[in-house]
Amino acid sequence: MFPLGLSMLWESVEPEAALEQRFGFNSFGAATHWVSAVLEQTWGLTVLECLRMAISDQNAIVWVASDRGGLVVKCSRATERFAYLEASARLLSALAGQGVPVPSPITSLNGLDRETLEGRSCAVSFTVLPELAGDWLDVQDHAAVRSAGACLAEIHRALGATHVDGSVFASRSTGLKERIGGWLENFDRGFAPEASSRLAEFLARAPQLGDQTQLIHNDFRAANILTRNSRITGVLDFDDVVIDHRVSDLAKACVYLGTMFTDWRPTPIAVRQSLRAGYESVRPLSRSESEWFEILELWHGLMAIPDENDTAGWASAL
């Protein structure tokens, strides 16, 4: 859990300075006083205490004790993403209605899942979520990892059956072979040349992927997964949903599953295998998907290498 009061989610900057520069408040107390007023006036909720606030880029998350129990208030000043965030909130509500373990937005007095309000220095998009019980996924708990894999497959099923306006969600405009080939040609920084050569060889003989694109989570990892007794109690952060292939989402999840906010290291192979096994217990991959999984896992792994000073060992994990 994050510390009480004000903190940064992952950036190495002073939180007080970030709060004032990004949201216009000169103290944690001033910011939480405003959040409390917003919840009362726009949601009809009584705030008992604002416990903590974490800032991440143009966003802030506030944990609140209220007359409706524990709440998580998500705020964003990224105006270019407001339409996307509104669609993401509607998507959360739809998924919760299908029994997916996600926090369903609490509707405002206007009947909306997300509201845009004028803040101290900028417009702010708000959504209010119930706080889900559980601890972040421990990737050393292989039973929990298998449960996470099964949960991802169920999320894919639910996303595929959810009827929402997908026009605001980014869609990959080119096929996987063209996309990866373009990356190898134009964006590969050469940090793991042997792995890059292997990827090019795999790509040259890759089969046609017999699978349609759909909405996928796109950020399925330990920091966004809550567990209790090796079972999944919540999946968080649908703010990066895109339209792409399900097997790409699974491969990316295998690569990044063990990452947390400031603890960014590769996922051990045994953990990746457990996640995939859990996924396939619900939705087995087709033959072409299995071949593409190996390609995509290698590609996502290559893209994860931060720079030449790869102290976490991303390159050696390939």
What positions do the PLM features span?
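A glycine-centered beta->alpha junction motif in the catalytic cores
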Residues: G111, C122-V139, G181-L184, W299-W314
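Active-site activation/catalytic loop segments of kinase-like enzymes and analogous catalytic loops
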Residues: V247-P284, E297-G313
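A cross-family kinase active-site recognition segment
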Residues: D138-F191, T213
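Active-site catalytic-loop/activation-segment of kinase and kinase-like phosphoryl-transfer enzymes
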Residues: L9-P15, T127, S167-P207
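Conserved NTP-binding catalytic cores of kinases and kinase-like/nucleotidyltransferase enzymes
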Residues: M1-L109, R228-R231
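ATP-binding pocket architecture of kinase catalytic cores
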Residues: S66-V164
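Active-site acidic catalytic loop and adjacent metal/ATP-binding pocket
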Residues: D57-R68, V72-V73, P105, L203-S248
